[in-house]
Amino acid sequence: MKILMVNKFLFPAGGAQTYIFKLSDYLVSQGHEVQYFGMYNKNNCVGNTVGAYTEEIDFHNAKFIDKIRYSFKIIYNREARKKIRLVLDDFQPDVVHLNNIYYHLTPSIILEIVKWREENNRRCKVVFTMHDYNLICPNHMMRNPNSNENCDKCLGGHFENCLKGKCIHGSRLRSALGTIEAFYWNNRKVYQNVDTFICCSAFMKKKMDSNSLFRGKTVALLNFTDTVEAMSVKKKDYVLYFGRYSEEKGLRTLIEVCKELPN
């Protein structure tokens, strides 16, 4: 099969990219052909044969005028939609595998995939791997960053709670944009065009199923890892955390739970 991997970053920038690159390596080893679409960056290590990428959006280092321009582009990215069409026409994929697309590529590319599929009478499947909770929580963490408490107020499509709580970086403006983005694409029912949503845990699947747009299309599939030969060593029992030191990762909760474990 021909598989088009879609992600905003096409270079090692975090766990999502590690997943994409490892999965792609495995797919290629099984005889499949893989190409990629995302933002242009000088550090990109994968790509597509037609050389089509969308402009890089850097919220943190952007000038004021660019931030104004980005405020529209993060909801509907016309350039991304135009550029992915070039890749679709050239590569002719059998499967488009979406990953982190929101706020940079935006779900506008799904509309172009559907249009291309219909115009060319293609049976191309669309798969969406969820690396966070963005489709059901505009700040993507299901956690209020101001109180550091878990939060599920937006579940079921109640995205106005993001604005009420200023849940995106404590900013009313950013939270408003996130709320608008969520309502816009849910009301357009663009996600009905996705065949399967892959959730990295049963918990995530349960939360995704709280929205009728996703219910019936979700599957729980744990992230994979390479197996290694176990070494027999003498050691005490311990708990290992492997990941980024960040508040939303739940390290405080892990520490508190460990305190309750028997010695």
Q: Could you say what each language-model-derived stretch is?
A:
Residues 85-105, 124-129:
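Short N-terminal targeting/anchoring amphipathic segment
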